[in-house]
Amino acid sequence: TDTANCQTGYIKLSKPENDTSNSWERKNVTQLSKTADESYQEVLGLPQYNNQGQAFNYQTTRELAVPGYSQEKIDDTTWKNTKQFKPLDLKVIKNSSSGEKNLVGAVFELSGKNVQTTLVDNKDGSYSLPKDVRLQKGERYTLTEVKAPAGHELGKKTTWQIEVNEQGKVSIDGQEVTTTNQVIPLEIENKFSSLPIRIRKYTMQNGKQVNLAEATFALQRKNAQGSYQTVATQKTDTAGLSYFKISEPGEYRMVEQSGPLGYDTLAGNYEFTVDKYGEIHYAGKNIEENAPEWTLTHQNHLKPFDLTVHKKADNQTPLKGAKFRLTGPDTDIELPKDGKETDTFVFENLKPGKYVLTETFTPEGYQGLKEPIELIIREDGSVTIDGEKVADVLISGEKNNQITLDVTNQAKVPLPETGGIG
């Protein structure tokens, strides 16, 4: 063979489809390409004999560099490619048990041979090694979570064993992991911390707040359709407090379902948001300052009272024809207003204070009240009539509180007839 006339050609090997082996080969090659660039085309023939009848001897003299691999010639037609190991980065993704993703604020430490470092919080929910720290083959490392993101708890598992073997393969706690672009991926989930909240129920009495028991509140959460669904209901205790726990982020609302006996019911509908870190966002001002837990406050008012006077004769039968006058705070009313005779008199919407009930007209044949009747309604809802406490005056629901009074008139005793001897 005339070596002066030798030419160099190129042949491309591609991984066959559905081939899982690590060996690629081509047989019966008859043509080569003159170039190895984008104009690659197998048009260069391979004659078996030269012009002197001598057989050509073909061999591969070199392999064009494959990025990321080193080359080794085994024989005239066989080359071995070995993937070059590059030190590895670590990327931890932090998620929440609530379904929220990419939590910031966690702290991870990595230790190993000649390595003791803290991962960098990238502020996008991922954590990676400092730029000057990479994981080497043939080494073992321990990853430790030392601090959970805000609003979350450290799990029972806080350490992970990372091994990079001599071949550069990676395993975490014994399970093989696939790297991408020299990065080891690892997702870690933290449990969302249960968030305690409260609402305190009170009323004003003599210029001071007085806590109220037996009010019922509902904690509601907005669903995907935009409507609120009740999560829990609780009654206030003797300190006026209802206690709730929030187990996931979302949009919430606190609603009063029923007030204490004798008091109005005001829904409130206090809307607030809990973000993925367990922080509450609320635009209202009714927040208890310096409370150990986030606490809403909710004021209720004593409902007005209705006084119903039943006029009766001394035999307890209804007696019509009387008139009554009630005077007190913002009140000076005489009934009946229309002049029609009645045995029932209703004075409505009375607020706490002292009242005087006077019988201004007595039916003929009966004795009127000797003294006016004193009625006292206190700010705590208790009622006395002439110093005697009246029971069962507080009413639930929307109806006013009710005071009932029976006023009995005695019939006049007729004077004896007198006369002389005729």
Name these PLM-found stretches:
Residues T1-G422:
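Solvent-exposed loop/turn and edge beta-strand elements of beta-rich ligand-binding domains
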